[in-house]
């Protein structure tokens, strides 16, 4: 298993500076991670810096609350793709899910999938805020909407991925949709637990520490 190709090397803090973005880009190139995941304002710069590498550019949409309108999420997605994003991590409308407005949730995802024009879309369902049945339903809606991944967490809601949630998500979506675990994956042991549970992508700021077998102190 090529550990590095599981990792979206992530920096989503609002105070992220260009120097810090440069650091994660340099690290991603050195370790040949699958992608760097950055806020939309950094996408164009990251795409330019990574043009001569295999490392993809991932960004986030409707992040971290998922509470922006569907039209806004679609516009954000189109803008990100124009600026060079290869992959899109969107946040669902969590309140709509809890209301039982499942058509709204699915249509929200579908709009982003359409706007992404064939680029990979990962759907963040924020598992820490959901019960068992809501995790199942959100995963089902992700699959029905045609997204590529269902993803556990933003890392901004006070909790991250658990192996139990990853397994539940994978059992729900089956072989057609992949699972991304994010939030709280700080070391190789955490990484292995998520992969064993069914994750094929790991979102973490601790990519270097994971590769080196060390421990990180970040929540994402």
Swiss-Prot record:
Q: What is the active site of this protein?
A: 89 (proton donor/acceptor), 151 (schiff-base intermediate with acetaldehyde), 180 (proton donor/acceptor)
The main location class comes to: cytoplasm
- Under Enzyme Commission nomenclature, its number is 4.1.2.4
Kindly list the GO molecular function terms attached to this UniProt entry.
deoxyribose-phosphate aldolase activity
Q: Name one GO cellular component term.
A: cytoplasm
Q: In which pathway does it act?
A: Carbohydrate degradation; 2-deoxy-D-ribose 1-phosphate degradation; D-glyceraldehyde 3-phosphate and acetaldehyde from 2-deoxy-alpha-D-ribose 1-phosphate: step 2/2
Q: Which reaction does it catalyse?
A: 2-deoxy-D-ribose 5-phosphate = D-glyceraldehyde 3-phosphate + acetaldehyde
The protein's matches in Pfam families, at most eight in alphabetical order, are given as: DeoC
> What are the subcellular locations of this protein?
Cytoplasm
| InterPro entries xref list | Aldolase_TIM, DeoC, DeoC/FbaB/LacD_aldolase, DeoC_typeI
Give the GO biological process terms: 2-deoxyribose 1-phosphate catabolic process; carbohydrate catabolic process; deoxyribonucleotide catabolic process
User: Entry's CDD domains?
Assistant: DeoC
> Could you tell me the keywords of this UniProt record?
Cytoplasm, Lyase, Schiff base
Q: Which family does it belong to?
A: Belongs to the DeoC/FbaB aldolase family. DeoC type 1 subfamily.
Role summary: Catalyzes a reversible aldol reaction between acetaldehyde and D-glyceraldehyde 3-phosphate to generate 2-deoxy-D-ribose 5-phosphate.
Protein's UniProt name = Deoxyribose-phosphate aldolase 1
Whose protein is this, by species? Staphylococcus aureus (strain bovine RF122 / ET3-1)
